[in-house]
Amino acid sequence: MSFSGKVKEELARNIGSARHCQIAELTAFIGMCGTVVINSFDRCSIKIRTENILVARKVFTLIEKTFNIRSDISVRRNIKKQTETYSVIVKKHEDAIRILQATKMIGEQQENAEELHAVNPMIVQQVCCRRAFLRGTFQASGSMSDPNKAYHFEIVCSTEEMAHQICDLICSFSMDAKIVLRKKSYVVYLKEGAQIVDILNIMEAHISLMELENVRILKEMRNSVNRKVNCETANINKTVSAAVKQLEDITYLRDQIGFENIPKGLVEAALARLEHPEATLKELGESLNPPVGKSGINHRLRKLSEMADKVRQEQGGLL
């Protein structure tokens, strides 16, 4: 199962205890993946579609617990795509009107569903209800990337108005949600790992949150180790390049002017480098008698390189 599927499975098992939160979550389901069907006799029914059986059960349970209404569930199989679509249906006109009035999608005195309202601010007035509403929107039309690969959270909306409402709700929790137009849909998204942790906490997907945090910690540890290895590799390459240049300069001086024409202290450093081509500056300094520090041996080797460059210039050699 994908990480996104695990999050939805966890959220589907979370049924809020407060009736106002149950109504807020059901409002999200109706608004995101529900339709109101009106027949020729002006009688209406509600149909909520999802490809996730656990989400379908969640909607069924919410309707039953909140309104004491028994809805029907139908299954439609797509053999070509090998997918199943579950529809939770409230068939009775009176039941559908009751639900639409409670979710404030129609007025309290309205007896038909010809004109549906957008999400009423009163439905998401309390913080707990905002959490429940976002929980519903994600289950209905959301997805998340595998955190091992990338950090991406999104909710796909059919209308710009709904996208802005969801974006504003997420931003009310001090997050920076954005909206992008993708084909004919409006997508509300988050891309930062820390904000995705926050949204999981807001939706109360605590098990998924811990899994994501574990992935983040491991990724940060790997990145830290990689940075350290890269830094050490760069230092090793730098040290090796410097040692190779020193050996070239020392060999050039030995062959061109001879060590007898070079000060004794520099000759000692030159012989030490020839004898220990792979040694670090610290190791070279310690091999001398008496030993010298890292800066001391570095100074001598630099003098040898300067001397070699000078001889090359005098003899018309390449720098």
PLM region descriptions:
Residues 24-32, 132-140, 271:
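Short, hydrophobic/amphipathic alpha-helical patches that form generic packing surfaces
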Residues 15-23, 123-130, 260-264:
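Structural motif
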Residues 48-50, 154-158, 287-292:
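Short helix-coil junctions and helix-kink-helix linkers
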